[in-house]
Regions:
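Bacterial N-terminal signal peptides
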Residues: 8-19
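Amphipathic alpha-helical interaction segments
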Residues: 14, 41-42, 108
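N-terminal secretory signal peptides that target proteins for export/translocation
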Residues: 1-4
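Alpha-helix capping and helix-coil boundary motifs
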Residues: 16, 29, 111-114
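Extracytoplasmic electron-transfer domains, predominantly the class I c-type cytochrome c fold
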Residues: 56-117, 122, 126
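Periplasmic/extracellular electron-transfer cofactor-ligation site
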Residues: 25-26, 31-58, 72-73, 84-95, ...
Length: 132
């Protein structure tokens, strides 16, 4: 019986292996949080070309060159402070980003780790999409 089960499992694995079937990609929480909170303005690729970008006086920042514009170092704290609403952004663009600072902090006083983790995950994703 065990041989039959093993052979059946092996046959199924072969069929799926050669049919293009694959396991779903692991969920990337940072990418998911970026897409739901940032991509409308900054674009899926982070280059400032999202569907809402045309509504602003100034084009949203190209997030793929943050490290390049900072001598090769990704400015973690500065980006964090912008996302959570503490650091002002370009004067030509009203503070539309404050909406996300408030949204991330709206989880309540007992859940301080949730917004920090979400912002950190977004920043981790941004670090991975930096232009080389």
């Amino acid at each position: 019986m065990q041989k039959f089960a093993f052979k059946s499992l092996f046959a199924v694995a072969l069929i799926f292996g050669f049919s293009g079937f694959g396991w779903p990609k692991a969920v990337d929480f940072g990418e998911m949080a970026y897409r739901t909170s940032c991509a409308d303005c900054h674009g899926i690729d982070g280059k400032g070309n999202g569907p809402m970008a045309a509504r602003f006086k100034a084009k949203p920042t190209d997030l793929t060159v943050e490290a390049k514009n900072n001598n090769g170092e990704f400015p973690f704290e500065a980006v964090y402070d912008i996302i959570d609403g503490r650091k002002p952004i370009a004067a030509s663009n009203p503070r539309h980003m404050t909406i996300w600072g408030q949204a991330f902090l709206s989880f309540g006083p007992d859940s301080q780790g949730i917004p920090r983790n979400r912002i950190s995950a977004i920043i981790d994703y941004l670090k991975r999409i930096q232009a080389k």
